[in-house]
């Protein structure tokens, strides 16, 4: 499933589309595209809010399996990808949210996304989930921890169509013992 939203002011929710074009600046026509962005609360330890930084969050990718897990934990029928700002929804990549940084997701056109990091949950989807599940959608942030997918940036441009097969490339890594 592929989703996009051209207007950031309209909110987090995105609409389904049949195909997208990945550009070096992100998804063509999506509000989260761009080479740079303003830093936000996720970066307060490094930068003052609003500092211009490289946009490594051009694309948000979730999995059908992890969305179902979140809904089960929250005891609601479903958590729709539209509600959580997803651009892509995959199936069959185990523990998608735990893909290591620098993993590559490559599509049949050659288009490639580099995983920047896990997309930690925030309160904004909780508001949308609550609106769609009155008095039931408590605890999204806790339920979605390590299950809200990954964010990444475009390494190679190209077309992506709904239903495309994804080849996943995982870099060799070892644990850094001094963190």
Show where each model-derived region lies.
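Short, glycine-/Ser/Thr-/acidic-enriched flexible segments
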Residues: 27, 66-67, 95, 112, ...
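Acidic/glycine-rich phosphate/pyrophosphate-binding loops and surrounding catalytic core
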Residues: 133, 140, 149, 165-170, ...
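Glycine-rich active-site loops that engage anionic ligands at enzyme catalytic sites
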Residues: 91-94, 98-154
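Electropositive, beta-rich accessory/interaction domains or terminal extensions
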Residues: 1-108, 178-179
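Generic structural signal for buried aliphatic residues
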Residues: 105, 113, 160, 166-167
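Short, charged beta-turn/beta-strand-edge "cap" motif at the junction between a beta-strand
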Residues: 111-113, 119, 167-179
